[in-house]
């Protein structure tokens, strides 16, 4: 089927449903992605503070500046992909997964190296390497996210591949959270252990990206680049004229910052509040393992309640569990049970988000006459990078404010502060995210179905 739009020709295979193999392969893409991304989110702050010897507040500044830089460059990367000419038989997005993942793996190892120089020299290297890593990540993650919208317009298939993507993401988070620390403690010198272990996982990430590249197919094909010139104003126009995108961006800033600050602070909580850093592996085995329950039931929940209400339910579960966990005394068993419930809750809206992005891409095409998958996804990714910079900054500056001292016995104030960063901030942020998706997001599943029908009628 061919659909004539204002400035390009789109080839769409609308009838064919996605096979289980293709859905799983798409999920393997985020599985591979997590073997590089999660390493930075979980372990890089601790590497900076405890191995490289960078003060916590300065380490937080690295995350803030580097992620803000990546947030700014994301729309540029996305637009450059959308405006690329001479798209070959491999498709618009898939080649980036094949080549970009190899580059990203190398960059992942480099961010876990620290030259034997002054603190100023270490800061310069950390800033430079992490900012370059961010660009490399954008050239992989944006095409990967855009690929989902190019594979199908079927709402059920989109929910399905979003579910597989979330399973892949949780699978990688599960493995990196459980397996990395036991491997690191086997090295007498952490300056050697970190790059070796991270290099092992990054290589596995490349393999899983290759599976995604090989087995996924682009069916909604743009045969021409947009005729409108690539300018800052064209990118801004795409953003401000898409109200569902604006709302999703705002929601994501709160939801992802909550999710990431949890990942970063758990290692500190295990080491200092519970007194044994190796407990982190066992806790994560249960916590992240439990979160698969939310993802498994996601398609059925969406059928029953719709995407919007299902996301609100998930946020509500997580908020309640985190607040109760914060108020109770620190106990490894109680903490693990409540943290598991919270992760089940947050896994639900996190999984739905990817389907919402694809819906928003269709909305943008319906409203403007131009289909810009990569630009739209990069603008959404902009919010994720802002959230990541916020969580990294809050983690670092928060540790400084509460009086955290690396590799030492912490004060009572510091222990309470670590617990607040781990549980109280996420509860507040997720409550705000629940309000935003519930009252500000207006694109319903029924409206999206009508939009897809309108687009097909133009054929």
UniProtKB/Swiss-Prot annotation:
> What keywords is this UniProt entry annotated with?
Cell membrane, Membrane, Symport, Transmembrane, Transmembrane helix, Transport
Subcellular location per the Swiss-Prot or TrEMBL entry: Cell membrane
Induction summary = Induced by galacturonate, repressed by glucose.
Q: Name one GO cellular component term.
A: plasma membrane
Q: Which PROSITE patterns match?
A: MFS, NA_GALACTOSIDE_SYMP
Query: What is the membrane topology listed in the Swiss-Prot or TrEMBL record?
Result: Multi-pass membrane protein
Highest taxon listed in the record's lineage: Bacteria
Mention one GO molecular function. symporter activity
Gene3D superfamilies assigned to the protein according to its UniProt record, in alphabetical order? MFS general substrate transporter like domains
Which GO BP terms, alphabetically? carbohydrate transport; sodium ion transport; transmembrane transport
Entry keyword annotation includes Metal-binding: no
| Pfam families xrefs | MFS_2
**Which positions, given as ranges, span the membrane?**
25-45, 52-72, 95-115, 123-143, 167-187, 192-212, 249-269, 279-299, 310-330, 332-352, 389-409, 420-440
Alphabetical list of PANTHER family matching this protein: MAJOR FACILITATOR SUPERFAMILY (MFS) PROFILE DOMAIN-CONTAINING PROTEIN (PTHR11328:SF24), MAJOR FACILITATOR SUPERFAMILY DOMAIN-CONTAINING PROTEIN (PTHR11328)
Describe the family membership recorded for this protein in Swiss-Prot or TrEMBL. Answer: Belongs to the sodium:galactoside symporter (TC 2.A.2) family.
Miscellaneous comment text of the record: Member of the exu locus which is required for galacturonate utilization.
Put simply, this protein is called Uncharacterized symporter YjmB
The organism's lineage is: Bacteria, Bacillati, Bacillota, Bacilli, Bacillales
Q: Which gene encodes it?
A: yjmB
């Amino acid at each position: 089927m061919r659909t004539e739009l204002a400035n390009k020709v789109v080839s769409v295979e609308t009838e064919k449903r996605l096979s289980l193999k293709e859905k799983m392969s798409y999920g393997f893409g985020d599985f591979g992605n997590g073997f590089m991304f999660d390493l930075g989110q979980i372990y890089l702050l601790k590497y900076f503070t405890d191995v490289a010897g960078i003060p916590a507040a300065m380490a937080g500044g690295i995350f803030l500046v580097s992620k803000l830089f990546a947030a700014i460059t994301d729309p540029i990367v996305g637009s450059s992909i959308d405006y690329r000419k001479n798209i070959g038989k491999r498709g618009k997005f898939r080649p980036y997964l094949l080549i970009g993942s190899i580059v990203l793996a190398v960059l992942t190892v480099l961010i876990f190296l620290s030259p034997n120089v002054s603190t100023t020299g270490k800061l310069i290297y950390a800033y430079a390497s992490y900012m370059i890593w961010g660009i490399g990540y954008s050239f992989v993650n944006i095409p990967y996210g855009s690929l989902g919208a190019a594979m199908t317009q079927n709402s059920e298939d989109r929910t399905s591949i979003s579910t597989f993507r979330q399973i892949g993401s949780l699978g990688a988070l599960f493995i990196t959270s459980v397996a990395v620390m036991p491997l690191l403690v086997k090295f007498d010198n952490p300056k050697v252990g970190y790059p070796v272990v991270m290099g092992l996982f990054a290589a596995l990430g490349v393999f899983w990206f290759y599976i995604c590249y090989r087995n996924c197919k682009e069916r909604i094909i743009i045969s021409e680049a947009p005729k409108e010139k690539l300018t800052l104003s064209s990118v801004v126009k795409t953003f401000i004229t898409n109200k569902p995108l604006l709302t999703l961006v705002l929601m994501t800033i709160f939801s992802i910052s909550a999710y990431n600050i949890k990942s970063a602070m758990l290692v500190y909580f295990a080491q200092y509040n519970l007194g044994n850093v190796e407990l982190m592996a066992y806790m994560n085995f249960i916590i992240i393992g439990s979160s698969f329950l939310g993802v498994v039931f996601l398609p059925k929940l969406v059928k029953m309640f719709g995407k919007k209400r299902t996301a609100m339910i998930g946020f509500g579960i997580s908020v309640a569990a985190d607040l109760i966990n914060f108020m109770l005394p620190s106990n490894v068993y109680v903490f693990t049970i409540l943290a598991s419930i919270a992760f089940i809750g947050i896994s639900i809206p996190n999984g739905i988000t990817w389907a919402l992005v694809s819906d928003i891409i269709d909305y943008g095409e319906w409203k403007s006459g131009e289909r810009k998958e990569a630009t739209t996804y990069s603008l959404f990714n902009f919010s994720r990078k802002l959230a990541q910079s916020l969580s990294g900054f809050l983690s670092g500056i928060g540790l400084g404010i509460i009086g955290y001292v690396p590799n030492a016995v912490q004060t009572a104030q510091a222990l309470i502060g670590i617990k607040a960063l781990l549980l109280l901030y996420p509860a507040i942020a997720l409550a705000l995210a629940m309000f935003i998706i519930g009252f500000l997001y207006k694109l319903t599943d029924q409206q999206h179905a009508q939009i897809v029908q309108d687009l097909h009628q133009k054929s």
